[in-house]
Amino acid sequence: MKKIMLIIFILFFSNGAYSTFFYRYDSVDAEDAFKIGFIPSGYNRNMYEHIRGTSCFEGDATSHFISTSASEPMAHVMAESATPVGMMYYLYTIRPTRNFYNSVNSLRAAFVRTNDWRFQSTILDYMHEQEWLALGGIDTEQIYSARAYRSRGPDQQAEFIAEYLNPAYFDADAGPNSGNYYIPNLSRYESSERSACSICSIDSMSSVFKRDTTSDIARWRK
């Protein structure tokens, strides 16, 4: 019964529909992003290891995914929590393509297939992020714009500075992948600790931050 209720809960809150654009917080300068896009830090295609952070910069920095969110407000929350007061960040507006996979839907498929509670735990930890992961990175022509902000700290609306449109942007009738990304069975000793990074781009090493907002705030205050 508990498993049935969990599946109903996840189905209700998961992203069956998606927005026209996705969003990504980063400290990478707009000019650089418009030239090269977002390149992943490595070739590890294990989505679970990216979500949990073991293949990001808090781990071995080998992830082949780039994180985005279908929620613009959530991208702002994460940026404001992680960026020190007075420092700039960019909010990128991105057109998704078939290499974008929904993390919650993929975790749910793995949970249903394996009945492994670690997938269930990860869903409940991160479903609020409305995350879509771009396998292999994000091309420059997919980046519509970059909005520059100056942080005022956690729970404070950042100061808007300017919006920059990408001259290389190409508009196309495309959307993210409607299927689930296959996540292999976990090893017996696979960690389920809540520690992960949403950056995982080779140009973003200075912007490493935990994805849990509470952890973000604690880290920012240090």
Where on the chain are the PLM-derived regions?
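Sec-dependent N-terminal signal peptides
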Residues: 4-13
